[in-house]
């Protein structure tokens, strides 16, 4: 509560459909509409779509520049992103975004000689205090989501093209959140790996 949250969606998921006859542009439009609705349900201030090609992301300088531009535009204290260091089952785009975001935060967004064209656009360097990696293999922070769990499920249900009728979704998510909260003074938890960045 009291925080301004901006969601940056790097791809629009235009290839993320099991329907071989689906038009990628229609898939992307559906995914973007669902993301806007999920963000609305969570009370996010803004959603930005970078519209990079789905399934083609690499943690290269081009992607890093786009993320640095977002950091310098929105000036976040905290960034929440995919944990790129999680082994095995991880979408390659998620891994690329996590790595590019980590490199964008430090040192690139901080130092003015990286992407000097940003200065010409009025975007000043920015130091982000923390990166919170979600879904980590080895979390070091579990946050109490007991009071907001229903909102989380409601937001996930906005992604109807991906979760379908969501049969069993709430039960699976609740079981996982309960596992993560074991030993904590609350019922349901969300796990993160938190990295303090150099200031």
Feature names for model-found ranges:
Residues 1-74:
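Active-site rim/loop-helix segments in enzyme catalytic domains that contact anionic ligands
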Residues 58-199:
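Metal-dependent de-N-acetylase/amidase catalytic core
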